[in-house]
Design a protein with these regions (language model features):
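Membrane-embedded alpha-helical bundles of multi-pass transporters/translocases
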Residues: 2-465
Length: 465
């Protein structure tokens, strides 16, 4: 594979912007838009029809199945991509097919079969489309992220790529969490907004045009890399060998535990954020935009601060501080509760304060899930000569799928319907405390990382070398 030039890295980092935006919108907004539970202000705009058009129990099962299916296809997809034989290489065909199918499923999700209340047909229809979406999103993104370790020339370029991607992730989430509530406040329905966003999947074309990979067909001659003109020798890796290789890495095993802990809480929060702010916090579209802007606007600066902490204290300590900041921000948001503070200005101030505190953790959360598997895969290639980055992302993806099935899929879908003593927003408000608990668990799980992660990223170490 031809290495990226320095000026090409920002464009390559931007490639995942559109597909990830669609994934955020469908998981955070469109799935919630099928039912009314937990919403307060702007109910007609936040939902497809101002009423619950799915059978909640059945749809929660279908949503959990979609998350589990996503996990089940992770490893087969990684193996398929790793061993794909085409004249255009392994990555580009997988990226294109995955993006086209996921975009079609996304658009169809915006068109329920009917607008009847508690519809079983809608539950099945939307559940199937959600399964198709997440499966082919996995194919496209696994193939794309699998190039990160191979398409960069050195560790500095790799770090630059993941940092720029984290910055684009910040913009993506700012649009999703800050601007979309503004559009809702203007009276635009979430279904329309979702359809307007669909063409963003075209950003994947940056990767399609920038990836220059040798043919993987038998007997093909290399056009790129260190052996131009020689016959391409592609290593075939079985599914079991790929699993053993990834799970045999001590640092990666520890990372999976950490990632699973904090990501369960994070996904619950991101999936239910609009319901939390609209319901228990009792804020409207413009106020929601302020809260979300306070959480995402400072992220680029917080990433710089995060890197400074890492340069002084190492990766483990820096990531623990990020987890602690997110938990503290959740405490502030839990206090911004209509039953505690009837004054909307006080609630908005508490929510904005919590958002700013959370932004430090958000910056780290954007960077780490791409940086860690990429770096581990690159280190493995240096150590063993074998390159199987897709499998690391696949195993991390399985953890993502499991926590999605447990957190947003089962806990959140049902928790938001829990009431206590006539308080219909009790379950939605309780979500903040669950997020805090999982952040604390992740802080302790960081101790499982190998000792060298106390030194990873420290400038003193680099200076000695």
């Amino acid at each position: 594979m031809r290495k990226l030039k320095r000026w090409q890295i920002p464009f390559f980092a931007f490639a995942s912007f559109g597909p990830c935006m669609l994934s955020t919108i469908i998981s955070v907004y469109l799935v919630d838009a099928l039912q009314t539970a937990g919403f307060g202000a702007n109910l007609e705009q936040w939902t497809f029809a101002g009423k619950t058009i799915v059978a909640v129990g059945l749809f929660s099962v279908m949503k959990a199945i979609s998350s589990l299916m996503d996990g089940l296809v992770e490893v087969p997809v990684a193996t398929f991509v790793q061993n794909l034989k085409t004249p255009w290489g392994r990555r580009r065909p997988a990226i294109l097919v995955g993006t086209i199918v996921m975009t079609l499923a996304y658009v169809l999700f915006c068109f329920p079969i009917s607008y009847e209340e508690n519809s079983a047909a809608n539950s099945i229809w939307c559940g199937i489309l959600l399964t198709v979406f997440v499966s082919f999103f996995t194919l496209a993104i696994n193939a794309l992220f699998g190039t990160y370790a191979e398409i960069t020339a050195n560790d500095d370029d790799r770090l630059l790529l993941t940092n720029i991607k984290a910055a684009f992730d910040t913009i993506q989430y700012s649009i999703a969490y800050a601007l979309i509530p503004v559009f809702i406040g203007f009276g635009i329905n979430i279904r329309q907004i979702g359809l307007y966003m669909a063409p963003l999947s075209l950003t994947i074309l940056f990767a399609v045009f920038l990836i220059k990979e040798n043919s993987t067909m038998p007997g093909a001659v290399a056009k790129y890399g260190d052996n131009v003109g020689a016959t391409v020798e592609e290593e075939t890796v079985s599914m079991m060998d790929g699993i053993k290789m990834s799970l045999g890495n001590e640092a990666f095993r520890a990372w999976l535990i950490i990632h699973g802990c904090f990501n369960l809480g994070l996904q619950m929060f991101l999936s239910g954020q609009n319901v939390l702010i609209s319901g228990p916090m009792g804020l409207n579209g413009f106020q929601i935009a302020i809260i979300n802007s306070s959480a995402f606007a400072p992220v680029p600066l917080m990433l710089i601060f995060y890197r400074k902490v890492m340069a002084k204290k190492g990766y483990r300590f820096a990531f623990q501080t990020a987890l602690a900041s997110f938990a503290l921000g959740m405490v502030c948001m839990s206090l911004a509760y209509v039953r505690l503070f009837p004054d909307a200005m006080i609630r908005m101030a508490l929510g904005a304060t919590g958002g700013v505190i959370c932004s430090y953790g958000i910056g780290a959360f954007f960077s780490a899930p791409t940086a860690m598997p990429t770096q581990i895969a690159a280190d493995e290639k240096k150590r063993t000569g074998k390159s199987h980055p897709s499998m690391y992302f696949a195993m991390q993806g399985i953890v993502n799928s499991l926590v999605s099935a447990i957190g947003p899929g089962l806990i959140w879908v049902n928790l938001r319907n829990v009431s206590l003593n006539g308080n219909d927003m009790f379950g939605t408000h309780a979500m903040t405390y669950i997020v805090i608990a999982f952040c604390v668990l992740a802080i302790f799980a960081c101790k499982l990382l190998p000792k060298e992660y106390d030194q990873l990223g420290r400038k003193e170490k680099a200076a000695k070398k």
